[in-house]
Swiss-Prot record:
Protein species of origin: Clostridium novyi (strain NT)
Cofactor(s) required for function per UniProt: Zn(2+)
Name of the molecule in the record: Isoleucine--tRNA ligase
Leading EC class: ligase
Pfam family, one: DUF5915
Length: 1038
């Protein structure tokens, strides 16, 4: 009837078998096709780059992204799950440069742009098979056979439509400004790309003396963290609100901020004059490096609000060619712009001492030069956060150039409004990391001076006219001899000319491609080739109900999605977002190849399986927190949840197969057993709780609720009901046990299906499909179980939960006293209200206690120690801690402990403080310990006391329990079946022989022994029975 299963469970083999079943039955496609008439639920899959290998961070994103769509399919939604590939941009180009052994744009041009672009195109799916393999192994169900691909002409055409729409809204413009620039890649970067590449670096700073014009030995002391920009200096910035001083030192007069003088100046000095910064404004000084003569007035002091007294001298060197703040100041005061650096980040020929040298490498040479000519006051190492290229790791320069921008500053208010509509998990992303980024949003520099990307569809004429093309049809209409099969990439698109409608001359496409983040941010509509086709599909599936990616996407995909949808559609493109933290090694350190601590996800999947890996990520921590990950962590996850569920499943199949129990024959049977009613009530409460959690995207909470339920199912329900399954007759009570456990298992696999799809399917196939040929063929094609209020009994759940809690506390007290559970004890005192006798009997049986007493006063059996929780109270009331300690010690310790343990607050007064201090379980530490002869345990308002004195009678019973345990283990080790009769033999201990004879009938009954014999000559197993030696042998009765 049921397939035989391995009790240990080889989960990896099981998952391979289930993956084959899904393939053979086309279950994945059937899941995609389900609920054709249902309400749409849209999930966007953030496109990875397929020319890079998947790593453990991608495992996290895939398991999180998979769960919600699975759940929504079971809830009746039509869920779109289209995979995508991000195929353009620097990541691809850099890989090809590496492959070809070339570096930088000049070598690419020499190699040939057409050949280079072809290499890029051919490479983008290099690791597709690895991505597909990982996705299949994980059970990540997205349509990878029909993905959207950002280099396809249809996709590019939709992106062109978006750019044309922005052009028509006057959001797309060309500007000359200082932009973050990668000299190695030869292109500008956007602000959100820059935000992803900051690193703390230690560099030499310069305190530079600028000679005041017309004054002998008088200098303005300025500071810079970028000495290479000094040859382009045209002004010095101060803050007119600050106080400045002129000091005399070693015959020189130096000017700097008053509050920084002591920190900056070395040696003795004398203050000659003190004045407001306003007096400095307009002061002229001599040019520091005379490599270029400026074409405008320069070399004087200006005011700037960004000058602070945090570091430096309160005077900042200003070079408008190389910094955003400097550039704005330059525009404000109409300062000249001296650019002495070429597109590769090297000094031009006019900078004779350092021509052709990369500017960062020139820093020490410049410092040495200034030291020799006396303009360097001093140099110090300074650690600061500096932007690096997010792809090649080169330090960025801020560089003046023509670029194309999207006018995001004009959309700032709408961006913030749309951001507030998004349900962020965690919520603080809205106003924190992402919200702050939006508050300070700048125009998006989307153009890239590169080769492999979506070409910017703007054509320019020498007369000044510009055209933005929004479709292939428009290109053919306005272009000259455009081929029908036009390839929209460079260099082919560069050959397409337009005729200028104003002057009749040829128009040429601007040379740039666009930021690849614009590509991925366009996927909501570009994946459907909107607006050229699939208009209805797009409108039904926009915005997405759910997305999830790593936290760094707040500066990447999360931003580009919101920015583009706000610009085009005036709304947000996603409604719910789970932000994921980073994956760390087992010690909590960032994984890196150099440290040798990178965990290969394929190894873990091969050794431990997908379900265990998935469950680890669902339960290890909240999704947005950093998660430690190692194979050992996954093993522990498997033990806690999967193995527990498997053991319950195995237990059911073992006994149901023995009895040939078919639940379909008992569909209308209703059990009156209290434990059955309790577990069915708990099951339905679980269904409702998990449903509410998943509806609110609380994945960890839902998973932990499920884990707790399975723990109670195994360690309480099954444990308490084993004997019902052992009965030889198929009584109503046994039918009730079977029917209940079957119902729980076949329901729980539906709840667990989105989390652990393989094990859920395995159990479903054996328990449901095996028995019913008309059953739905996969658990993943089933509907979510319905919450049945009629079986929910909150009072029953509360009573049973309290009994179980008391049992766990009793076990804890036993462990604390180092007394095994098999050793009977005389009495247990319980602080809580009385429970019906049924539960008292359970507690006695579970804890091996003769008597229980509810509502007991435990104060006479315990010592209390109540102390302030210093990290909490100390932070709030630091200097009052001694007085708080005194107040606490003067109170009734038992009463205070009971109030705190019951969740009540207690208020105290302390000398010197007007307000009362509230004492709670959060700011107090309550330690309670049983007195001699008693063991205590307590938690959340429940306390128990065990009397630990062991009488001779109790000691004998303890021996018997221990002997029964040893015999049962020997039965298992000998391979006996559960129902096999045995013969028992003991030897080697007269004391225990007396006890065995006294309890012989009981031992026979419990072990199915037909004979007990003593001191025969045979092979025995040596055993320890509570410190006593005993020889035991078992033999199967023929």
């Amino acid at each position: 009837m049921y397939n035989k299963i391995e009790t240990s469970g080889n989960f990896v083999n099981m998952e391979e078998k289930i993956a084959k079943l899904w393939k053979d039955k086309d279950v994945i496609q059937k899941s995609f096709d389900r609920n054709e008439d249902g309400e749409y639920f849209t999930f966007y899959d953030g496109p990875p780059t397929a020319n890079g290998k998947p790593h453990v961070g991608h495992v996290l994103t895939r398991v999180m992204k998979d769960l919600i769509p699975r759940y929504k399919v079971m809830k009746g939604y039509k869920v779109l799950r289209k995979a995508g590939w991000d195929t353009h941009g620097l990541p691809v180009e850099l890989e090809i440069e590496k492959k070809l052994g070339i570096s930088g744009k000049p070598q690419i041009e020499e190699y040939g742009v057409e050949k280079f672009v072809k290499e890029c195109k051919d490479s983008v799916f290099k690791y597709t098979s690895l991505w597909k393999d990982m996705s299949e192994k994980l059970g990540f169900w997205v349509d990878m056979d029909n993905p959207y691909v950002t280099y396809h002409n249809t996709y590019i055409e939709s992106v062109w439509w978006a750019l044309k729409t922005m052009w028509e809204k006057d959001l797309l413009y060309k500007g000359h400004r200082v932009t973050p620039y990668c000299p190695r890649c030869g292109t500008a970067l956007s602000s959100h790309e820059v935000a992803q590449g900051y690193k703390d670096v230690k560099e030499a700073t310069a305190f530079v003396k600028f000679k005041v014009k017309g004054e002998e030995n008088k200098y303005i002391l300025a500071w810079t963290t970028t000495p290479w920009t000094l040859p382009s200096n045209v002004a010095l910035a101060i803050n007119k609100a600050y106080d400045y001083v002129e000091v005399e030192q070693n015959g020189e007069h130096l000017i700097l901020a008053k509050d920084l003088a002591e920190k900056v100046l070395e040696g003795e000095y004398k203050v000659v004059k003190e004045f407001k910064g306003e007096e400095l404004v307009g002061t002229e000084y001599e040019q520091l490096f005379k490599f270029e003569v400026p074409d405008k007035k320069a070399f004087y002091v200006v005011h700037a609000d960004y000058v602070t007294l945090t570091d430096g001298t309160g005077i900042v060197h200003t070079a408008p060619a190389y910094g955003e703040d400097d550039n704005m100041t330059g525009k404000k005061y109409d300062l000249p712009l001296i650019n002495l650096v070429d597109g590769e980040g090297k000094f031009v020929d006019s900078v004779t001492p350092w021509k052709g040298m990369f500017v960062k490498k020139a820093d020490p040479k410049i410092l040495e030069f200034m030291k020799e000519n006396g303009s360097l006051y001093k140099s110090e190492k300074f650690t600061h956060s500096y932007p690096h290229c997010w792809r090649c790791d080169t330090p960025l320069l801020y560089y003046p150039k023509d670029s194309w921008f999207v006018r995001m500053t004009s959309l700032r208010d709408k961006l913030l409004e749309n951001n507030n509509k998004i349900n962020w998990n965690p919520d603080n992303i809205r106003t924190g990391r992402f919200g702050k980024f939006l508050e300070n949003v700048i125009d998006w520099g989307i153009s890239r001076d590169r080769y492999w990307g979506t070409p910017l569809p703007i054509w320019e004429c020498e007369c000044g006219h510009r055209e933005c093309i929004g479709s292939i049809e428009e290109l053919k209409e306005k272009g000259i001899n455009v081929p029908d099969d036009i390839e929209l990439h460079k260099p082919y698109i560069d050959g397409v000319k337009l005729t200028c409608p104003h002057c009749g001359k040829e128009m040429t496409r601007t040379n740039e491609v666009i930021d690849c983040w614009f590509d991925s941010g366009s996927m909501p509509f570009a994946q459907h080739h909107y607006p050229f086709e699939n208009k209805e599909v797009f409108e039904k599936t926009f915005p997405a109900q759910f997305i999830s990616e790593a936290v760094d996407q707040t500066r990447g995909w999360f931003y580009s999605l919101l920015a583009i949808s706000t610009a085009l559609f005036d709304t947000n493109s996603y409604e719910n977002c789970i932000v994921l933290g980073h994956v760390l090694d087992k010690h909590g350190l960032k994984m890196s190849k150099s440290k040798g601590n990178v965990v290969d996800p394929f190894d873990v999947l091969q050794n431990e399986g997908a379900d265990a890996t998935r469950w680890h990520f669902y339960t290890a921590s909240a999704p947005w927190l950093p998660t430690r990950f190692s194979e050992d962590d996954v093993k522990e996850t498997q033990r806690k949840f999967l193995s527990t569920l498997w053991n319950v499943y195995s237990f059911y199949v073992l006994y149901a197969e023995l009895d040939q129990f078919n639940p379909l024959e008992y569909k209308d049977f209703v059990s009156e057993n209290v434990m059955d009613k309790w577990i069915l009530s708990k099951l339905n409460t679980l269904i409702k709780t998990v449903e509410e959690d998943l509806d609110n995207y609380k994945i960890t909470e839902a998973a932990l609720e499920l884990e707790d339920f399975v723990d109670e199912l195994s360690n309480w329900y099954v444990r308490r009901n084993r004997s019902r399954f052992w009965s030889t007759e198929l009584t109503d009570d046994k039918i009730g046990a079977y029917k209940t456990l079957y119902t729980v298992l076949t329901t729980i696999v539906k709840v667990a299906a989105p989390f652990v799809p393989f094990m859920a399917e395995e159990i479903y196939q054996n328990l449901v499909v095996n028995l019913d040929k008309d059953a739905i063929e996969s658990v993943h094609l089933c509907t979510w179980p319905e919450y049945d209020l009629s079986v929910v009994d909150n009072e029953l759940e509360g009573q049973m939960d309290l009994a179980y809690k008391i049992v766990k506390l009793g076990r804890s007290a036993r462990n604390g006293a180092n007394i095994k559970n098999r050793q009977p004890l005389s009495e247990m005192l319980i602080s809580t209200k009385s429970l019906p006798d049924y539960y008292g009997d359970i507690i006695k049986e579970e804890l091996n206690i003769k008597k229980v007493e509810f509502g007991a006063d435990l104060s006479k059996y315990v010592n209390f120690e109540i102390k302030p929780n210093l990290p909490v109270l100390g932070k709030a009331y630091g200097r009052y801690i001694p007085a708080i300690r005194k107040a606490i010690s003067s109170m009734d310790q038992m009463e205070l402990a009971q109030n705190i343990n019951n969740g009540k607050s207690v208020f105290i007064n302390v000398d010197g403080l007007d307000e009362q201090i509230e004492l709670t379980e959060n700011n107090l530490l309550v330690a309670m310990q049983g007195l001699e002869g008693f063991a205590f345990a307590g938690s959340s308002g429940v306390g128990v006391i065990l009397e630990t004195t062991i009488t001779e009678e109790l000691r004998e019973e303890g021996f018997v329990r221990e002997i029964l345990s040893k015999v049962q283990n020997l039965r298992k080790e000998s391979g006996f079946e559960v129902a096999d009769k045995i013969k028992l033999y003991f030897a080697g201990n007269e004391t225990l022989e007396v006890v065995i004879k006294k309890f012989e009938e009981h031992i026979k009954k419990e072990t199915l022994a037909v004979l007990i014999s003593y001191n025969e000559d045979r092979e025995y197993v040596d055993s320890k029975i509570n410190g006593e030696e005993l020889k035991i042998a078992v033999e199967k009765q023929d």
